[in-house]
């Protein structure tokens, strides 16, 4: 029934015509019915709750130092989009960026082999999590104590303003770019609107109006706003849990046996008539699933006609230029104010015995200290003024001979047009001054 659904339209269309068609062909054929689908509000805990769970590992996997520790804190509700975006920035600043302080202190103190952060805002009551992987469950209390002491120190001395600036730019850049890879943009926008629409019918578009929020957060960065969020929600908030998940060998087999026993008990409770009906129903379902569609049903599937497909191929906007002896390809297309840069270096000049080390080199460039920056400051500086600088290796096939290949070391970067000179400066900083001797 459409009363228990959410419908949205995306694209350049005659909206009135589409709405009328939807009403005539679909909605008008149903009577209105009440639907109780409001998500309930969980009351805050009076104290932090402790939970222990188990997960299955194979006989060859270790049980020692293979636990997960997580500290999870509820952060208001998802209808305050500015606060949600602020916590996305705090997740980046405290846990995700290289040199992030919360991640750094936990790793230095030997809490787990990896530290992850997350801010889950796709639900009515979002939560912020700090997670230690490959940890010792005996470190649970120290894990929580270190988190609290680190956060208290950050509140006292202030969040790194350059990291906040980088976090805001990092998230704003991706919002403006709206690059969802192979996923249709309209689909992803639709998923975004559910973050508020599901919980307030009057707020379907809040998640699509973030540009003003980014501007507001930039102004609040020096006002103590982010420190207040940490104090209120991460330090003075008992609506939280500490969850320990321990490995257990044979747990999967135990669960499979329990399920088999439950099914056997259910089967034993059935009469012969009920068993025969169950077998018949299963057979009918299998036949239905395997049956070929009728010609009538196949004709209901919309199909493209040949004339619907343009005979014109997509225009390629390639302009060849030369800067000294370097070939430059320039693509003059609409990129919403974002400049995309790719530098390619032919690897034929790399000695064969050193080629395997190129994979290591591309992984550390941008993640080690340079002449003017430590690795954390370098990462924040780049993200504060660009959409990132990435190093990689690509292999190109000859357009005339698919048996010929050219391996290339590459650098990809993106920024607003005004910051392209900055991007070149940072590429130069990384390539010429990275301290690769730092083990």
What are these language model-derived features?
Residues 34-35, 243-263, 267:
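Terminal amphipathic helices with adjacent charged low-complexity linkers/tails
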Residues 35-99, 129, 184-207, 269-366:
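His/Glu-based metal-binding/catalytic segments typifying zinc-dependent metallopeptidases
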Residues 230-233:
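Core subunits and conserved enzymes of cellular information-processing
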Residues 210-213, 217, 256-274:
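C-terminal helical/tail subdomains of lipid-metabolizing enzymes
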Residues 4-10, 66-76, 103-218, 238-248, ...:
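M16 family metallopeptidases and their MPP-like homologs
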Residues 6-66, 157-160, 178, 263-267, ...:
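An aromatic/glycine/proline-enriched structural segment found at the starts
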